[in-house]
Regions:
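Residues at secondary-structure transition points
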Residues: 30-41, 68, 97, 101, ...
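Switch II (G3) loop of P-loop NTPases
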Residues: 18-40, 63
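Residue-level signal for inorganic ion chemistry
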Residues: 12, 89, 132
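Conserved C-terminal guanine-recognition region of P-loop GTPase G domains, centered on the G4
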Residues: 44-116
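Single conserved hydrophobic/aromatic residue that forms the stacking wall/gate
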Residues: 1-8, 12
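Anionic group-transfer/hydrolysis microenvironments
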Residues: 15, 24, 63, 91, ...
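Canonical P-loop GTPase G-domain recognition
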Residues: 94-147
């Protein structure tokens, strides 16, 4: 996953073209409120301090309607001047017939801005991975989708 419940900020490099920065998650981390507040400051400094930041991805569990934390994080990211790309994780845990219903629940629950992208994704089956990388390549790296 790209955002998770650990205190570390990890950086992943893709073919010398970009860095993917994995910031601490907020959901189920078993840390103090004080530490969560420190994470918030870290994330805010990163969002405002990075001159090369091109996109923000918000990972949300597709199995559930957006939580209060999901809504708060989405609104906060928008308030920081970004329209995050929503990655709806754990796709492999849903029946195929439930996917569109849950995507709609995410869109409605978060009151997404027009044009916000929601990509269902499974780390287990890799479903949605190509769609994410194609979006990154075309929208943020200025490439076509052919490899």
């Amino acid at each position: 996953t790209l955002m998770r419940s650990s205190a570390a900020s990890d950086v992943y490099k893709r073919q010398e073209e970009m860095y993917l920065v994995d910031l601490p998650g907020y959901g189920y981390a078993k840390v103090s409120e004080q530490e969560k507040a420190q994470w918030g400051k870290l994330i805010e400094r990163y969002l405002h301090g990075s001159k090369q930041l091109r996109a923000v991805f918000l990972l949300i569990d597709i199995r559930h309607d957006p939580s209060a934390n999901d809504k708060m994080m989405y609104d906060w990211i928008v308030d920081q001047g970004f329209n995050p790309i929503i990655i709806a994780t754990k796709l492999d845990k849903l029946k195929r017939s439930q996917v569109q219903k849950q995507v709609k629940a995410i869109k409605t629950g978060l009151k997404l801005l027009p044009g916000t992208v929601v990509i269902p994704f499974s780390a287990e089956t890799k479903q949605g991975r190509d769609e994410i990388w194609n979006l990154v390549d075309t929208e943020f790296l200025g490439k076509g989708t052919e490899e």
